[in-house]
């Protein structure tokens, strides 16, 4: 049997190319989504592009399923609008997104889903604050950052509770222009930092998709560069489809019950059984 690298690659590429598109799987077989979507862009190297380019995707919070994704050349407003519009065409019942501090994401989402709740990842926001402080050399800066950590620790019960703690921090550091500027920025972004207060069960970080990104990164390390945009589309689709049909093993806390289950299993319509879908996949090869 000839198992040369070239022949193995050709065979794998053919199999990957025969897989149904992630969006087609969702359109035909899935409907049980919670509507809370954690979104991000993951960058990959593709031949012909000077810089890494992203595939944009989101994870339905309660099912951990990936309804669809979009390949793009940047995280522009147009790219994100195309992604959210693809979700709308799939009848994805989006009510809230959790995202990093890229204004294109929120604007594009609201352009397609005007009533959506926007929750900014508090971890990303705090990291930006850390970068503006001299935490290594200045004890006062470290103390202030501890206060900010306390302000964002867990979920506040109400905006008034958040304001109360914020006011205490302001009064303590009112004579420090840098700290006051940071607190004013927090106040200006309060509507998206406290988006979780506007709906039930909305997380305040993108930790879930960060863990998926780490998983995908492990696979990208074995591929220095995709040969073309088309090749990247095929391999990314295969990777995501595989993730949707692979059992979870490392879920913790409130999601421990997902271990041993597939995300497609949680999002599929009640009339779709896994054995039937396995037969459909088998017919592709």
Regions found by a protein language model. Name each.
Residues 3-98, 103, 208:
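RNase H-like nuclease fold core
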Residues 7, 207, 211, 234-238:
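Amphipathic alpha-helical interaction segments
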Residues 10-14, 18-19, 78, 122-132, ...:
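Short alpha-helical interface patches
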Residues 32-36, 147, 255-259:
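Short alpha-helical linear motifs
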Residues 51, 56, 106, 212-213, ...:
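Short, hydrophobic, well-ordered secondary-structure elements
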Residues 89, 93-98, 105-231, 247, ...:
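Extended amphipathic alpha-helical interaction segments
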Residues 218-283:
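Basic, amphipathic alpha-helical segments enriched in Lys/Arg and hydrophobic/aromatic residues
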